[in-house]
Amino acid sequence: MNKIDAFILFSEPGQALKTVNELQNYESINNIYLLTPENIKETIKGCGNIEIDTLYSSNTIKKIAQKAKSEYIAIYIKSTPLKFGYFALERMLQIAEDSCAGMVYSDYFTIVDGKKEYHPVIDYQQGSLRDDFNFGSFFLFNTIAFKKATKRMKNDEYKFAGLYDLRLKISQETGIVHINEYLYTEFEEDTRDSGKKIFDYVDPKNRQVQIEMEQACTQHLKDVGAYLEPVFKPIEFNKEIFEYGASVIIPVRNRIKTIKDAISSVLRQKTDFLFNLIVVDNHSTDGTTEAINDFKDDARLIHIIPDRNNLGIGGCWNMGVHHPKCGKFTIQLDSDDIYSGEDTLQKIVDAFYIQNCAMIVGTYQMTNFDLEMIPPGIIDHKEWTPENGRNNALRINGLGAPRAFYTPVLRKIKLPNTSYGEDYAVGLHISRNYQIGRIYDVLYLSRRWEDNTDASLDIIKMNEHNLYKDRIRTWELQARKKLKLKSL
């Protein structure tokens, strides 16, 4: 019956003792090992100690593989106490055996400020390549699958990407199974709003972490036949004739507080080409329509109210892009935001010709409603490289802003008719064949306020968003595999 070797973090000995006591209640537990940082010399009776450098390193993963002798490996990655539900560990073991999974994980409860909350997680897909995919804090591995994956890990030097590399390797040969049952309770340590957490990967202090994660993901794409070499289709910008050099598109619904600022920031632009502004007003009811009409005397403004009622943000974009007055380049501006200067459009259009790209992504600065800079400040996505950006794009959670497109390419691909992830989906699709260029000057001020769509999401909405983006990645991964097979 002793089928599991458990490995738990031993950074807080007092807290770890509670978890050890919990595990020792189960007959299925064979051995308990304490993953111990170098500076801790204590131990717990009945447990073995494994000295580690970091919890997520390749070295730690290999030490676990060497120590494990039972059929299954359990890993708990938090220092706070763990509490199982009734027969929960047996349930997890049962599903692991029945499904022949390489790894299983489950929904869980959290204790936040003394309050118990439900914390469902999402299913794992081929495209679940985010290194911050939430498996919870307790997961169970088939030991044979774990050891096979460890042997196939090509980099032994990861300090941060070892566990990520492991699960990618496991996913290549066996299933990663989500048990949508609440099997344990953990104590929440990161209580920031979702809108703050989503920018963790661009925090400069996390840069070395991101370099390792990119390396692990890139190797995974090579392993599964989805890696794309840095060879891109060239763009011939003079093949089609346009009346306007560029169009800014603003999809909007009920943004009476901000729409005038957004429109004004476009109309103030100074360029050496003709441009216009296409505002797709998705049946606003709060006075936004009337606010847009205040600019009707400016011939550059095209105000569209769709004749259909089923458009998301992506659908509004498609309507603007396919308007006969749309310019050669299509440039994004959200209705909450403004351009940082009067030369933004000129810089973007110049970059298309200099970099020969089908899409350009700029740099933006986070501000409050009064345009004062707030953390995390400037979002420049310097993790992007011309050589590997389109591969790493399958791992990160967004491409940045402002986004701009060569209109003929965008008209051909089109955006999904959604109000989340539509920009990411089309960016991935474009990057499959074309180079995406970058501008590292701040072009755009992104205002965060209570009505932003991702300012603070509940767990259900966050899961919905993450599941959809993983689906987008899955479809793109499949398309790239197909593309690679055609080239053989």
Q: What are these model-predicted stretches?
A:
Residues 36-43, 81, 281-291, 309:
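A conserved acidic beta->alpha catalytic loop
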Residues 21-30, 264-274:
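Short, acidic, metal-binding catalytic loop of nucleotide-sugar glycosyltransferases
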Residues 81, 86-118, 343-376:
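Conserved donor NDP-sugar-binding/catalytic core segment of glycosyltransferases
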Residues 157-166, 419-426:
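Acidic donor-binding loop at a coil-to-helix junction in glycosyltransferase catalytic cores
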Residues 54-67, 307-325:
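Glycine-rich, basic loop-to-helix element that forms the pyrophosphate-binding segment
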Residues 70-83, 327-338:
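Short beta-strand-to-loop acidic/aromatic patch adjacent to the donor-nucleotide binding site
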Residues 3-15, 26, 37, 246-258, ...:
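A conserved hydrophobic helix/loop-capping motif in glycosyltransferases and polysaccharide synthases
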Residues 117-144, 383-404:
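A recurrent flexible, glycine/aromatic-enriched loop bordering the glycosyltransferase active site
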